[in-house]
Amino acid sequence: KQKDLISYWAMDHYAGLLLQTGANGEGNYHFLKVFEQAPSRRHSAYYSFNISTEEDWAATYKQCQTPKEKALMHFIRGTRQEVLGLEDMRSIFGLMGNHEWLRIVMAREINKLESNNLSYYGQLPIAQLMQRVDKGQSLLKNEEYEDYAGQLLRFATTAYYNNRDDSFWALAKGYLE
């Protein structure tokens, strides 16, 4: 255990050095491995895994040797606050099926959608909200997210019908409806 801890600590630092030298694909791949295999270093690896260009994404993705590693890349990107994670969820689903990472990204997307776009009941009188519902208007602050919310609902519905024994998808589908 102690040897593993030290080796992942060293790999975490080595990955940072690779990024500093411009070997972004290799550096991010090492952060990915640390995230996957070393729970005590996961926080550091998550925030150090920083892909800002398509070129870096492709270079890192090329390093991945298994579908699980590729899905983990999509998981990390999909959980970022500044990213709409639906495409990453589709990739995770294609690579791993109904994996726990898929459910986590969906939960984060629902949370992001809610915190960034919904008018809270305490801020608007319930009568105003009900008038918007009666008129068929969106409850979202940013109506551009209306289509995205619909896409999330379609994804949750598909996942629900393909995984009826997983109550998470019934809950996600119901919440998004």
Where are these regions (language model features)?
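Alpha-helical solenoid repeat scaffolds
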Residues: 1-177
